[in-house]
Amino acid sequence: MTTQRSPGLFRRLAHGSLVKQILVGLVLGILLAWISKPAAEAVGLLGTLFVGALKAVAPILVLMLVMASIANHQHGQKTNIRPILFLYLLGTFSAALAAVVFSFAFPSTLHLSSSAGDISPPSGIVEVMRGLVMSMVSNPIDALLKGNYIGILVWAIGLGFALRHGNETTKNLVNDMSNAVTFMVKLVIRFAPIGIFGLVSSTLATTGFSTLWGYAQLLVVLVGCMLLVALVVNPLLVWWKIRRNPFPLVLLCLRESGVYAFFTRSSAANIPVNMALCEKLNLDRDTYSVSIPLGATINMAGAAITITVLTLAAVNTLGIPVDLPTALLLSVVASLCACGASGVAGGSLLLIPLACNMFGISNDIAMQVVAVGFIIGVLQDSCETALNSSTDVLFTAAACQAEDDRLANSALRN
């Protein structure tokens, strides 16, 4: 009987929920650090390997995803989605801005292996802008080797637009390459429970259990900022659009879209749920059939919050001063990063190095920040996806209702 059950148990562990596996790895890492400090330090190699794999795959991931997305864009879509697209972009930027304010009000720090002496922080907005411009003109091979994500992004956008004029075979090849890289990322992330087990064990063994409080505070800041956006910022944007009480619509979207997204942890997987909710709300089919998939790709308020909060936590840890113009620029960069986070589990975490580049933070340190993100990702990723996906249907409904009101008022005047 035991021999029959064991393969089933192993299969469930290997192919089960990644969230549950990460939670198990987190708990086991804490227990090992509490029971045996030497053993916990030894298994730190697992965490090092996991971070190394992430660092290896992240640059090519950004290049292929952005290039394939632009190259395969379909022309001639006759739908009125401009107001919705504007809400998507405004909502994402507002979320990043709220995250900056929240991070300044409740500053967090991380436990990293490098100090401020290892980097050359920019002195202000002028130096930041100069660094951004110089990063844009980097050699593409050099950008990939050194993890210069801004340079990678520029080359990906340029190649994507150039490939729009290519034949379908070329576009299909780029798309297949993007899918292949995405598969590799998913494969790496399947090892997240083992990597997190090693990271948590070695971190607690070397820094003590007080590290947990630092992560707990960071998680409170992240989730608190997401709640602020969901219950304050988004309702304000919806009220501005429909000019009436936004909370019935906001709460409906959170209940019937956000709850599902919280457990699926995938905006793409939640598209059918959002489509059904749009149909229930009697929205224009030609509009939401385009805006919902589009939102699952570019409407990333939760990702913008994650990128901003974790980047500023790294900045605070390294003692880098941040002035107001630089903080505003970070909001813009985080918004752009968030729009490239779709389609990949943990995508927002893998784009944190791009924002960290603004402050002269090396790729090695930035990937340590990504690893911290994976440790708290059990709850962070679920909350992020719930905010992202529920906002897709919320802004679609707001824009459609505003258009219906406009048409009704025009009919009354006539």
Curated annotation (Swiss-Prot):
Periplasmic topological segments: 37-45, 105-142, 201-217, 321-331
Membrane-crossing segments per the record: 16-36, 46-66, 84-104, 143-163, 180-200, 218-238, 300-320, 332-352
Positions in the Cytoplasmic compartment: 2-15, 67-83, 164-179, 239-299, 353-414
Catalytic activity as recorded in UniProt: L-serine(in) + Na(+)(in) = L-serine(out) + Na(+)(out); L-threonine(in) + Na(+)(in) = L-threonine(out) + Na(+)(out)
A Pfam family the protein falls into: SDF
Activity control summary: Activated by valinomycin and inhibited by monensin.
Stored PROSITE patterns: NA_DICARBOXYL_SYMP_1 (PS00713)
Major localisation: membrane
Any one biological process term the GO annotation gives: threonine transport
One cellular-component annotation, GO: plasma membrane
Upregulating conditions: Repressed by tryptophan.
Record field: temperature dependence: Optimum temperature is 40 degrees Celsius.
Keywords: Amino-acid transport, Cell inner membrane, Cell membrane, Membrane, Symport, Transmembrane, Transmembrane helix, Transport
pH dependence: Optimum pH is 7.0.
SUPFAM superfamilies recorded: Proton glutamate symport protein
Membrane topology: Multi-pass membrane protein
InterPro entries documented for this protein: Na-dicarboxylate_symporter, Na:dicarbo_symporter_sf, Ser_Thr_transp_SstT
Family: Belongs to the dicarboxylate/amino acid:cation symporter (DAACS) (TC 2.A.23) family.
NCBIfam families reported in the protein's UniProt record: PRK13628.1
Known role: Involved in the import of serine and threonine into the cell, with the concomitant import of sodium (symport system).
Protein name in UniProt: Serine/threonine transporter SstT
Organism: Escherichia coli (strain K12)
